[in-house]
A protein has these predicted regions:
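Soluble extracytoplasmic domains of inner/organellar membrane proteins
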Residues: 60-63, 70-72, 76-174
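Short helix-capping and inter-helix turn/linker motifs at the boundaries of alpha-helical repeat units
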Residues: 11-12, 47, 119
Length: 174
């Protein structure tokens, strides 16, 4: 019974610490939120660990610490004890927010999602198109758009986005 009380108290403290970090994020106190999330993420047994690493990554992004942000996301996607969905989400966020890495590095982070039956595969494929455009690989972007538009499993919203991108870049190519 003493262990259960101690364990419940520990969980309450962890949740309060995590939500305090979220509050600091909301108030744009990114240095303080990073400090809180770092402390939360170091507790390996805590249920808030993964969420705290995501919070730390976002705090580092807001502080302009892109290398640290990438490292935080890498901690998530390389940890085999963390679920695939969260690993894939960390990969996608690291690519979306990273304005320093080169094309090969960014595409390398997306490859595991693109080559697996992930729930986030279509989103990663769209993000790859954005990378092609960002790095001026417009032929690859147009080809990827064609391939994605031919898939039966894309949503109407995705079709609309891809069609719009295709129209914009095809009109500039003429």
């Amino acid at each position: 019974k003493v262990y259960m009380i101690w364990n419940e108290k520990k969980l309450t403290e962890s949740s309060e610490q995590f939500f305090s970090g979220l509050e600091k994020l909301d108030n744009k106190d990114f240095e303080k939120s990073a400090e809180i999330f770092l402390n939360s993420s170091l507790d390996q047994k805590d249920g808030y660990r993964v969420l705290s690493i995501f919070g730390l990554a976002h705090s580092n992004f807001e502080n302009g610490k892109i290398s640290e942000m990438v490292s935080n996301y890498q901690t998530i996607y390389e940890d085999k004890t963390i679920g695939n969905y969260y690993q894939d989400l960390a990969r996608i966020l690291s690519v979306m927010k990273d304005n320093k890495s080169n094309f090969s590095e960014l595409q390398g982070r997306l490859k595991p999602i693109l080559n697996s039956p992930s729930k986030l595969q279509l989103l990663a494929a769209e993000l790859q198109i954005v990378l092609f455009i960002r790095f001026n690989k417009l032929d690859k972007a147009r080809n990827s758009i064609k391939i994605l538009l031919a898939r039966a499993d894309i949503t109407q919203e995705q079709k609309n986005r891809l069609s719009l991108i295709d129209k914009v870049y095809n009109s500039h190519a003429k």
